[in-house]
Amino acid sequence: MRVNFTIEGTPVGKARPRVTRTVTYTPAKTARYEDLVRYTAINSFKGMFDKDEPLDVKIVAYFEVPKSLSKKRKSLCLANQELPTKKPDADNVGKIIMDGMNPKMKRDKRLHKMVEVMRGVYHDDKQVTTLLVKKRYAERARVDVRIKRDMGD
């Protein structure tokens, strides 16, 4: 089984949780992007990977070439001769995509436990045994994601 999908728009990195005296919460921008990832993934994949199935995930974050660059440098960027070394960090892009593919959970105060609000692509990101995250330049900003069963090769 293999899943491919594209999240249109500029890649976003996972932000640190915010902490007040009594509450810890995820910033709104991070939560919205995780929801966008979840909806895009669910719409492109109607099933769900098995609980114990090892997964291989490849994430390629494409950034627009800066408009301030010369034509020569733009062509180098598009030919992958010059790579993006700007924010967000590759690990934070990977984290937000991985968390977005998890099921959305919410604490039920009456039951005192977490309940699933919306399904994900897999049961938990602990199933991912191989992860590759790349940052590249392209004409339009987007994130391409490929998930498949990890064969251990």
Each model region followed by its residue ranges:
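Acidic, proline/glycine-enriched N-terminal capping motif
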Residues: 1-153
